[in-house]
């Protein structure tokens, strides 16, 4: 029986389409570790960062639904990404879509490299970006849409909005050929998600109960915790977009701190002038505004530009 079990184990290992005993030639271990940490930080932004931030802004009766939506959307987009999303974004194709040459990550093994890191790490890092982008739209649609509908939307929007935009900007498509610069996702992530959220909110209309009852953030400490997690995760988001632990990553890192700090102060001062006192929600809003603002240029502008 034990011999049969050993044979089955070896057959199972042999069925994998990658060489699990591949050499490490060409991999920079420092860059690899750096990018894996950055990927984990971006994933941390989704679960629990976005879930806590948006959950605190909603009414208490809708918090669990939004958190569940965030987690399931992350899972859905991750599966889409490894099946065909990465291929349509980063393989050779036309101006708008890549091809299907890397369908199900075909042709990618543990020996495959993206610069100085394993290509699997690049797949995971970019997949985290895709999941984050779709999760951002959830906040605009919160308390407006059914669970099943948001999943259908996530599938369609990821396929026909996020993937072509990623290819056009980062995959050698139309905008990349025109010289577009988007260091960490100002276009691919934030403008993309913002337009989807705005159009979705407009088409779906007002939230249930709007105008009939007070709709206030039910838990500001939860919003603060979500903001703090997003702030920390953003270092992986921006610095990781350098692709390695180099001086560009360092510039993106310090620019992230400076931009967020300047935006927090600006928002709080504006509240002091127009509302006589600052607020925690205002400080959190300013922080995220600064982080979003510096994202596309974190690795290209100087400190003064970030401020």
Annotated model-derived regions:
Residues 2-307:
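Hydrophobic alpha-helical transmembrane bundles of multi-pass membrane proteins
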């Amino acid at each position: 029986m034990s011999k049969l079990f050993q044979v089955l184990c070896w057959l199972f290992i042999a069925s994998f389409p990658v060489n699990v005993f591949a050499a490490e030639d060409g991999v920079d271990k420092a860059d690899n570790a750096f990018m894996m940490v950055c990927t984990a930080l971006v994933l941390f932004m989704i679960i629990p960062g976005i879930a806590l931030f948006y959950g605190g802004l909603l009414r208490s009766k809708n918090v669990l639904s939004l958190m569940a939506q965030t987690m399931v959307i992350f899972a859905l987009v991750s599966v889409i990404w490894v099946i065909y999303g990465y291929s349509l974004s980063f393989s050779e194709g036309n101006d708008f879509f890549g091809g299907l040459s890397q369908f199900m990550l075909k042709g990618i093994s543990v020996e495959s490299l993206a610069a100085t890191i394993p290509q699997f790490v690049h797949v995971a890092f970019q997949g985290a970006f895709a999941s984050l982008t779709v999760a951002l739209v959830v906040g605009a649609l919160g308390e407006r849409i059914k669970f099943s509908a948001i999943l259908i939307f996530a599938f369609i929007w990821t396929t026909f909005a996020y993937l072509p935009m990623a290819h056009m900007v980062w995959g050698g498509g139309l905008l990349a050929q025109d010289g577009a610069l988007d260091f960490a996702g100002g276009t691919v992530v934030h403008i993309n998600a913002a337009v989807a959220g705005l159009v979705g909110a407009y088409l779906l209309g007002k939230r249930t109960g709007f105008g009939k009852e007070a709709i206030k953030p039910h838990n500001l400490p939860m919003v603060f915790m979500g903001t703090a997690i997003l702030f920390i995760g953003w270092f992986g988001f921006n610095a990781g977009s350098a692709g390695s632990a180099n001086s560009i990553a360092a510039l993106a890192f310090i620019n992230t701190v400076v931009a967020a700090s300047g935006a927090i102060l600006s928002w709080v001062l504006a509240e002091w002038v127009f509302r006589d006192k600052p607020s925690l929600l205002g400080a959190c809003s300013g922080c995220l505004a600064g982080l979003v603002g510096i994202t596309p240029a974190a690795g290209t502008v100087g400190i003064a530009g970030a401020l």
